[in-house]
Amino acid sequence: MEPVDPRLEPWKHPGSQPKTACTNCYCKKCCFHCQVCFITKALGISYGRKKRRQRRRPPQGSQTHQVSLSKQPTSQSRGDPTGPKE
């Protein structure tokens, strides 16, 4: 390896940047284009802001699952709660 100028920042070292720009393509060649492409495209890791998903609302006429659970009878405890008598 050839010596690198110590005054250069690490991201400006020769060979640290690919000669071509990154693309939005997800083919194998583009996924291994550079370290950033590999992390975002091949591994699927992105640290950007996540888009908030809209909650899917149930139709007006249907009941929610939570309401149907509250109408169920409570389970009866079996046996004496204080323990067996001997």
From Swiss-Prot:
Cross-link (Glycyl lysine isopeptide (Lys-Gly) (interchain with G-Cter in ubiquitin)): K71
UniProt keyword Ion transport, yes or no: no
Chain sites annotated for binding Zn(2+) 1: C22, H33, C34, C37
Binding site for Zn(2+) 2: C25, C27, C30
PTM-bearing positions, type Asymmetric dimethylarginine: R52, R53
Protein name from the UniProt record: Protein Tat
Interaction with human CREBBP as annotated region, ranges: 1-24
Annotated stretches, region: Interaction with the host capping enzyme RNGTT: 49-86
Entry's Gene Ontology cellular component terms: extracellular region; host cell cytoplasm; host cell nucleolus
Known outcome of mutating R52K: Decreases methylation by host PRMT6; almost abolishes methylation by host PRMT6
Cystine pairings recorded for this chain: none
Keyword Transferase assigned: no
Domain notes: The cell attachment site mediates the interaction with ITGAV/ITGB3 and ITGA5/ITGB1 integrins, leading to vascular cell migration and invasion. This interaction also provides endothelial cells with the adhesion signal they require to grow in response to mitogens. The Cys-rich region may bind 2 zinc ions. This region is involved in binding to KAT5.
Organism annotation: Human immunodeficiency virus type 1 group M subtype B (isolate BH10) (HIV-1)
Region (Cysteine-rich) residue spans: 22-37
Site features described as Essential for Tat translocation through the endosomal membrane, chain residue numbers: W11
Molecular function (Gene Ontology), one example: protein serine/threonine phosphatase inhibitor activity
Keywords: Acetylation, Activator, AIDS, Apoptosis, Host cytoplasm, Host nucleus, Host-virus interaction, Inhibition of host innate immune response by virus, Inhibition of host interferon signaling pathway by virus, Interferon antiviral system evasion, Isopeptide bond, Metal-binding, Methylation, Modulation of host chromatin by virus, Modulation of host PP1 activity by virus, Phosphoprotein, RNA-binding, Secreted, Transcription, Transcription regulation, Ubl conjugation, Viral immunoevasion, Zinc
